[in-house]
């Protein structure tokens, strides 16, 4: 690994992270709020960019595997730490609480440490939403689209930062792919903002919520989240944008080239829609028969939460802690499943579960017919044993980390149900905590040790374990080539 190459890439990323702070600065000036916390953070970003640039090399032609892993890991860690500064400089949060809020924003988790958002300046609320937007599609993807290419290693870094069921790209060149994905991301955000305004939000609230919806983050500028609006049409519009943000974004690029039928033919997205639809109907029936809500309202709340949980956005519209256990457990299943590969959603991803089920089915058939060869397919793509084994590995590592975080959180004083619920929601980057911690989670009241564990869990879930785990191997730090 060449440290100079890593420094060169990091210098550009630090510079980009500083530029993003212009938006909250403009917001602070518009509303007459303090802007120095953002300016100071911007200067720190630019200073680090300059230092990294001086340590780097003039140009980067290619990156090897270790350099890509180092760039991804250091980018997410360093930007998360840099974006602690506005919270601390504003005097509203301690460094630890600021770190949890920053990581929750960057990873799209959406659980907050703020007990009351009414005391938070609008510029800082917008900054929270912007951290969602930057981390949602991926720091590398966005900066590859906006800034000069990083070399052939861009493709490797994008694969490490966001997962998909296929390595195939919508466009032949990685720069074109990043630009197309970013354009879709931008259009969806703008469309959501306009629709939210039409259904009753103020322009600021609409922008803040759209910056959280499309990256499936969940930060809201209001304490009551979407529940502050007594509008079924608004809730269903939020549901719509959460669902389309849970699909593989490459599908939308392909649909532009080949027609809308590409989306309807995608196996993973069809299964995802089936899961959301079935969950919504089951929860609505349960809420209605239990006398919790009348059927029309039960349908609205059920589908809203099915979309919010499966997309791992985590918006709330009511207190689901009073729901029957059956409905709450469906939410647990959805938050662990997550959205589609290549989307902004978290969780295990639907394609992995499809392939796990198909692999088990093929294994059972192999037992019945030992001489036959069975292939595992999803759509038109055939998956080989090595790819399927990697999915099995990830599945068990994912569950293993949930149990590990749960164990560590119980050591800090949490009860088992609360620790397990918090572990699941942070690993899946959901923000909804299906336990006694509450319907609107306030992480600020948790012990310091629990906050640190939760922050680690968020990062591990967002980068899907293996990228950060690679840093723990001694061979990663040796000078031999990988």
State the predicted function of each range:
Residues 1-482:
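Membrane-proximal intracellular helices of multi-pass ion channels
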């Amino acid at each position: 690994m060449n440290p100079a190459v890593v420094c060169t890439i990091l210098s550009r990323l630090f510079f980009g992270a500083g530029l993003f702070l212009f938006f909250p600065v403009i917001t602070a000036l518009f509303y007459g709020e303090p802007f120095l916390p953002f300016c100071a953070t911007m200067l720190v970003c630019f200073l680090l960019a300059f230092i990294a640039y001086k340590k780097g090399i003039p140009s980067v032609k290619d990156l090897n595997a270790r350099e890509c892993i180092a760039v991804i890991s250091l980018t997410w860690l360093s930007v998360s730490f840099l974006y602690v500064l506005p919270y601390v400089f504003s005097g509203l949060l301690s460094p630890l609480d600021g770190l949890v809020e920053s990581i929750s924003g960057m990873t799209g988790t959406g659980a907050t440490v703020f007990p009351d958002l009414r005391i938070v300046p609008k510029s800082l609320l917008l900054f929270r939403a912007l951290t969602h937007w930057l981390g949602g599609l991926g720091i590398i993807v966005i900066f590859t689209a906006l800034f000069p290419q990083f070399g052939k290693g861009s493709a490797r870094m994008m694969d490490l930062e966001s997962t998909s069921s296929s390595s195939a790209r919508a466009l032949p060149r990685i720069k074109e792919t990043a630009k197309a994905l970013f354009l879709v991301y931008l259009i969806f955000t703008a469309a959501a903002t306009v629709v939210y305004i039409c259904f009753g939000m103020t322009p600021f609230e609409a922008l803040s919520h759209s910056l959280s919806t499309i990256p499936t983050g969940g930060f809201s500028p209001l304490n009551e989240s979407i529940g502050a609006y007594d509008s079924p049409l608004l809730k269903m519009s939020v549901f719509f944008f959460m669902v389309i943000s849970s699909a593989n974004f490459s599908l939308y690029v392909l649909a532009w080239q080949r027609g809308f039928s590409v989306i309807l033919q995608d196996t993973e997205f069809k299964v995802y829609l089936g899961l959301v639809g079935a969950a919504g109907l089951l929860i609505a029936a349960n809420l209605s028969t239990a006398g919790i809500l009348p059927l029309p309202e039960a349908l609205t709340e059920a589908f809203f939460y099915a979309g919010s949980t499966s997309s791992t956005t985590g918006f709330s519209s009511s207190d689901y802690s009073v729901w029957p256990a059956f409905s709450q457990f469906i939410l647990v299943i959805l938050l662990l499943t997550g959205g589609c590969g290549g989307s902004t959603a978290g969780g295990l991803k639907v394609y992995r579960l499809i392939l796990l089920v198909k692999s088990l089915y093929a294994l059972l058939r192999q037992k019945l017919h030992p001489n036959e060869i069975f292939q595992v397919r999803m759509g038109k793509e055939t998956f080989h044993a090595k790819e399927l084994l990697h999915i099995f590995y990830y599945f068990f590592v994912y569950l293993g980390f949930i149990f590990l975080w749960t164990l560590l959180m119980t050591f800090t004083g949490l009860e088992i149900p609360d620790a397990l619920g918090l572990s699941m929601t942070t690993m899946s980057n959901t923000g909804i905590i299906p336990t006694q911690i509450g319907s609107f989670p306030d992480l600020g009241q948790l012990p310091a040790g629990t906050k640190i564990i939760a922050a680690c869990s968020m990062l591990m879930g967002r980068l899907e374990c293996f990228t950060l785990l690679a840093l723990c191997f001694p061979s990663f730090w040796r000078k031999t080539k990988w």
